[in-house]
Amino acid sequence: MEITMGVMDENATNTSTNYFPLLDPLGAQAASFPFNFSYGDYDMPLDEDEDMTNSRTFFAAKIVIGMALVGIMLVCGIGNFIFIAALARYKKLRNLTNLLIANLAISDFLVAIVCCPFEMDYYVVRQLSWEHGHVLCASVNYLRTVSLYVSTNALLAIAIDRYLAIVHPLRPRMKYQTATGLIALVWVVSILVAIPSAYFTTETVLVIVKSQEKIFCGQIWPVDQQIYYKSYFLFIFGIEFVGPVVTMTLCYARISRELWFKAVPGFQTEQIRKRLRCRRKTVLVLMCILTAYVLCWAPFYGFAIVRDFFPTVFVKEKHYLTAFYVVECIAMSNSMINTVCFVTVKNNTIKYFKKIMLLHWKASYNGSKSSGDLDLKTTGVPATEEVDCIGLK
């Protein structure tokens, strides 16, 4: 959903406005930042602007973003549900890494089933016009923002956990009480940092052409608070992108050196070789996820920086919306990549989910098994090599 984030002069008129409508990436986890969207020439009456939503390139971009949203709803909705269901049923899956992944899965699942339908209506059906009221506008924007930060912070926590487990194996591992506190910290930090995205979110009616109005939903910062807006964006850019990416890169670089370039002392038994293979597989998947995160979100942050700090670059740019949609689709695809990697590659959770369905089907078909028998069987299923791999210390 296009969120109108920006700065607005409260005393400005419709003919000469200092208002920068912002495309807040509600549809792509971008809904979290104050990003200025210059819809037209700032000194030009808005009702003389061309309606870019009627162009062919915009139509093609609309189709692409619609397909991306459908993909998110299907892949993230179904895939993350499978992961969460398997984790809830099988205790052997509940190691620290999987618990951290579960938080990422929960946040993406909520976005897929709650936010994406509204984004589909905003981006594709109504072509950048919000018709669901201020409360939902702020709520969807806030949930999108929190989800993005939870994903980033969870990936950072996973990288640090892998670093401690592999590079410093003699140190005591984190207890479940500490892990619970870490998970709570991931959510609390994300919830607090995202508060401005809800506080400054509002609806604004804009006249795009003489006879057409569109209701933009997004963050609007008063013009006298522009310095705070830019400071907030740089703060977010630092603690939710640059900082985590640098930290994760250093962690995985050190882990790679430990696993691939350092000789293992002593006699290598089959169990030791198996553990090494498992750890390498896990780290490779996590490194691919980090690479995908950077490739998906770096263009979006770069686009936002140019838009917010060098707005004249986009003045009178006819294909601005199309460019935004391309960047938006790339960013949105990151959640699907995470889901595919964590669910189908790293954890073999589909196999466990099939066992859940099979056991429930047998119980209902036979009508003789009690829920206690069912729980006894499901909690006693031995862990697979993939699960053991993740839990190796």
Curated annotation (Swiss-Prot):
<dbReference type="GO" id="GO:0032870">
    <property type="term" value="P:cellular response to hormone stimulus"/>
</dbReference>
<feature type="disulfide bond">
    <location>
        <begin position="137"/>
        <end position="217"/>
    </location>
</feature>
<keyword id="KW-0472">Membrane</keyword>
<dbReference type="GO" id="GO:0007623">
    <property type="term" value="P:circadian rhythm"/>
</dbReference>
<keyword id="KW-1133">Transmembrane helix</keyword>
<feature type="topological domain" description="Cytoplasmic">
    <location>
        <begin position="85"/>
        <end position="98"/>
    </location>
</feature>
<feature type="transmembrane region" description="Helical; Name=7">
    <location>
        <begin position="323"/>
        <end position="343"/>
    </location>
</feature>
<feature type="topological domain" description="Extracellular">
    <location>
        <begin position="201"/>
        <end position="232"/>
    </location>
</feature>
<keyword id="KW-0812">Transmembrane</keyword>
<keyword id="KW-1003">Cell membrane</keyword>
<dbReference type="InterPro" id="IPR000276">
    <property type="entry name" value="GPCR_Rhodpsn"/>
</dbReference>
<feature type="topological domain" description="Cytoplasmic">
    <location>
        <begin position="167"/>
        <end position="179"/>
    </location>
</feature>
<feature type="topological domain" description="Extracellular">
    <location>
        <begin position="120"/>
        <end position="145"/>
    </location>
</feature>
<feature type="topological domain" description="Cytoplasmic">
    <location>
        <begin position="254"/>
        <end position="282"/>
    </location>
</feature>
<keyword id="KW-1015">Disulfide bond</keyword>
<comment type="function">
    <text>Receptor for prokineticin 1. Exclusively coupled to the G(q) subclass of heteromeric G proteins. Activation leads to mobilization of calcium, stimulation of phosphoinositide turnover and activation of p44/p42 mitogen-activated protein kinase. May play a role during early pregnancy.</text>
</comment>
<feature type="transmembrane region" description="Helical; Name=4">
    <location>
        <begin position="180"/>
        <end position="200"/>
    </location>
</feature>
<feature type="transmembrane region" description="Helical; Name=2">
    <location>
        <begin position="99"/>
        <end position="119"/>
    </location>
</feature>
<dbReference type="InterPro" id="IPR017452">
    <property type="entry name" value="GPCR_Rhodpsn_7TM"/>
</dbReference>
<feature type="topological domain" description="Extracellular">
    <location>
        <begin position="304"/>
        <end position="322"/>
    </location>
</feature>
<feature type="transmembrane region" description="Helical; Name=6">
    <location>
        <begin position="283"/>
        <end position="303"/>
    </location>
</feature>
<dbReference type="GO" id="GO:0004983">
    <property type="term" value="F:neuropeptide Y receptor activity"/>
</dbReference>
<feature type="glycosylation site" description="N-linked (GlcNAc...) asparagine">
    <location>
        <position position="36"/>
    </location>
</feature>
<feature type="transmembrane region" description="Helical; Name=5">
    <location>
        <begin position="233"/>
        <end position="253"/>
    </location>
</feature>
<keyword id="KW-0325">Glycoprotein</keyword>
<feature type="topological domain" description="Extracellular">
    <location>
        <begin position="1"/>
        <end position="63"/>
    </location>
</feature>
<dbReference type="InterPro" id="IPR000611">
    <property type="entry name" value="NPY_rcpt"/>
</dbReference>
<feature type="transmembrane region" description="Helical; Name=1">
    <location>
        <begin position="64"/>
        <end position="84"/>
    </location>
</feature>
<keyword id="KW-0297">G-protein coupled receptor</keyword>
<comment type="similarity">
    <text>Belongs to the G-protein coupled receptor 1 family.</text>
</comment>
<dbReference type="Pfam" id="PF00001">
    <property type="entry name" value="7tm_1"/>
</dbReference>
<dbReference type="GO" id="GO:0004930">
    <property type="term" value="F:G protein-coupled receptor activity"/>
</dbReference>
<feature type="glycosylation site" description="N-linked (GlcNAc...) asparagine">
    <location>
        <position position="14"/>
    </location>
</feature>
<dbReference type="GO" id="GO:0005886">
    <property type="term" value="C:plasma membrane"/>
</dbReference>
<protein>
    <recommendedName>
        <fullName>Prokineticin receptor 1</fullName>
    </recommendedName>
</protein>
<feature type="topological domain" description="Cytoplasmic">
    <location>
        <begin position="344"/>
        <end position="393"/>
    </location>
</feature>
<feature type="glycosylation site" description="N-linked (GlcNAc...) asparagine">
    <location>
        <position position="11"/>
    </location>
</feature>
<keyword id="KW-0675">Receptor</keyword>
<dbReference type="GO" id="GO:0007186">
    <property type="term" value="P:G protein-coupled receptor signaling pathway"/>
</dbReference>
<keyword id="KW-0807">Transducer</keyword>
<feature type="transmembrane region" description="Helical; Name=3">
    <location>
        <begin position="146"/>
        <end position="166"/>
    </location>
</feature>
